[in-house]
C-alpha cells in the first residue's frame, strides 16, 4: 500500500462511484510504468466518455487489470504488459461483461481472435495448461534411463526392453517392444548422472496390464513419504519415485513369468496432459457472447482431435477432475498458451 494518491482522486471525480475498487482505491498506486514500455491503442466499441476495461485470464476467470476512457471510439492504455491475451470489457452494476473480442498484444502487434465460422480447421490437442520450464526439467530427467527385464532379482540375465533417448512430450508414453521379452522382474534404471525419477510404469502381456506384487528401489530421502518406490505402481500420475543418489533404480516383481510386449511410463509431471478416460469440453470465445461450447469428448488416447473455427481463442476444460486450465490459441498447428 502507498500513501494517499491525490492525483488519482482528483482525476476520477465522481466516476469512482461506478468503478471497481481496484481503479479508485486512493492508497494504491499504478507502478506499471516502471516495468512495461508498450502502449495499447484499440477501438473500444463503446460510446465516447465511457470507461473501457481490459482483463486477463487466470484460474477460469477474466480479471480486470487496466482501464481508460473511450474517445472517438478508441482507447489508449500506456505501460501495458505485452505478449499476453486481453479482453475488452465493460463494468455495469458490479459485474464485468465482454465488450469485444479477445486479442493478443505484443508491443506493436495486435491480433484479434475473431472466430471464422465459415472456415474450420482440424486441431490436435495434448494439454489444457502451459508447459513451464520446471515441467520440462522434470520430464527430461528420464533421458538415458533404461527398462530391463529379468527372470531373477539380481538381473544377471537382464535384457534391455527400452531406452529413453529424448525428453518425452506427453505424460503417458506407450512403447511396443520390437521383440517380446519373457521375464518376472523389471526395473527402471536412471542414467548414471541422474537420479531415478519416475511417476508410473506399467507392463503389458498380450494387451493386458500385469499388476506387480511388490515394488522396491534404491534408497530415497529419509522421512520423505512423497518419493517412495511404490508410487510407480499406484496409478496416480502426480505421485512419483525419486532416488536419493544418481544412477538409482526401481524394481517391480510381476509375481509370475510373463511375456512382456509393451510398456508404458510416465515421467514426473503435472497431470495436465490429455488423460484417457477423462471427459473434456472445448470452448471458443465469441466476443460479447462470451464462451461458446464446441462440444464434449471422452479421451480414449493421449490427444483430442477437434474441428474448430479458424482464428479463435480456446479454453479446454477437464470435466472429470483437476483445476488447472488456461486459454490458448493455435500457432503453426500447435497450442500456444499465453502466460505471465
What role is predicted for each listed range?
Residues 90, 102-182, 194-262, 268-275, ...:
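Disordered, acidic Ser/Thr/Pro-rich linker "stalks" and the adjacent N-terminal cap
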Residues 2-3, 9-34, 95-129, 335-340:
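Extracellular beta-sheet/turn segments enriched in Thr/Pro/Gly and aliphatic residues
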Residues 49-69, 147-154, 158-162, 270, ...:
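Short amphipathic beta-strand segments in non-cytosolic proteins
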Residues 70-79, 174, 251, 301-306:
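Short, surface-exposed beta-strand/beta-hairpin micro-motifs centered on an aromatic residue
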